[in-house]
């Protein structure tokens, strides 16, 4: 088929097609930097709240760290004070124990020193010839006087009503002359020391 026939039938001639050239708009070239500057600040507007929140959290954390450090310092101060008080208490306790021991030793030494003359008199009474009752009685009176000055007092028994806090009943005996519960005889004298019973009196009680 000839070209003329193809033209008549509306066909375009075969062959390589031409690319259409796109013409760029006329004007000055576009600067990328100016485009970025003139772009709407959408990205910065989105990150601003996040940065602000981050700053607030950091400030809160810093404040919490300061408060925690203050609490730790206060705790350490209390612990140091407690350790000092404990050490002072322990030292005071030891001093009091030493002082109490010293007082006990001094009191015992003083009592023994006062009893030595009584011991000497007993030795002399045993060496004496004849009846020694008077010498022993005098020695007993001397010993009683020394002990009474230290706080020793005898417990009243005969004729008293039985008191279990200071009396020990070793026997009960019917009696028409005494009321029930009355002490009618003392087997062994009891003593009080500074107002406290150190040995109960052993007695016979009427029933």
From Swiss-Prot:
Compositional bias (Low complexity) at which positions?
A: 32-47
User: Which regions are flagged for Basic and acidic residues bias?
Assistant: 1-24, 51-60
Biological process according to GO: protein folding
Predominant cellular place of this UniProt entry's protein: cytoplasm
Question: What Pfam families is this protein classified in?
Answer: GrpE
User: What residue spans carry the region label Disordered?
Assistant: 1-60
Q: Which GO terms describe its molecular function?
A: adenyl-nucleotide exchange factor activity; protein homodimerization activity; protein-folding chaperone binding; unfolded protein binding
UniProt keywords (A-Z) are:
Chaperone, Cytoplasm, Stress response
Q: Which GO terms describe its cellular component?
A: cytoplasm
Which InterPro entries does the UniProt entry name for this protein?
GrpE, GrpE_coiled_coil, GrpE_head
Q: What does this protein do?
A: Participates actively in the response to hyperosmotic and heat shock by preventing the aggregation of stress-denatured proteins, in association with DnaK and GrpE. It is the nucleotide exchange factor for DnaK and may function as a thermosensor. Unfolded proteins bind initially to DnaJ; upon interaction with the DnaJ-bound protein, DnaK hydrolyzes its bound ATP, resulting in the formation of a stable complex. GrpE releases ADP from DnaK; ATP binding to DnaK triggers the release of the substrate protein, thus completing the reaction cycle.
| Classification via PANTHER family | GRPE PROTEIN, GRPE PROTEIN HOMOLOG, MITOCHONDRIAL
Question: Family, per the entry?
Answer: Belongs to the GrpE family.
Q: What is the recorded name of this protein?
A: Protein GrpE
Species, as recorded? Rubrobacter xylanophilus (strain DSM 9941 / JCM 11954 / NBRC 16129 / PRD-1)
What phylogenetic lineage does the species belong to? Answer: Bacteria, Bacillati, Actinomycetota, Rubrobacteria, Rubrobacterales
Q: Which gene encodes it?
A: grpE
């Amino acid at each position: 088929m000839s070209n003329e026939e193809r033209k008549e039938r509306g066909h375009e001639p075969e062959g390589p097609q031409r690319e259409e050239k796109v013409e760029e708009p006329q004007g000055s070239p576009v600067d990328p930097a100016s485009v970025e500057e003139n772009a709407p600040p959408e990205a910065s507007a989105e990150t601003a709240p996040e940065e602000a929140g981050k700053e607030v959290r950091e400030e809160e954390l810093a404040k919490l760290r300061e408060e925690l450090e203050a609490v730790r310092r206060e705790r350490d101060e209390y612990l140091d004070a407690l350790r000092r008080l404990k050490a002072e208490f322990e030292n005071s306790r030891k001093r009091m124990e030493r002082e109490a021991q010293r007082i006990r030793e001094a009191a015992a030494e003083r009592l023994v020193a006062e009893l030595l003359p009584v011991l000497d008199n007993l030795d002399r009474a045993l060496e004496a010839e004849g009846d020694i009752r008077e010498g022993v009685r005098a020695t007993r009176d001397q010993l009683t006087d020394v002990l009474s000055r230290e706080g020793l007092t005898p417990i009243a028994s005969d004729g008293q009503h039985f008191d279990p806090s200071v009396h020990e009943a070793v026997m009960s005996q019917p009696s028409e002359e005494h009321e029930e519960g009355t002490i009618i005889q003392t087997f062994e004298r009891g003593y009080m020391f500074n107002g406290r019973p150190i040995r109960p009196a052993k007695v016979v009680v009427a029933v």
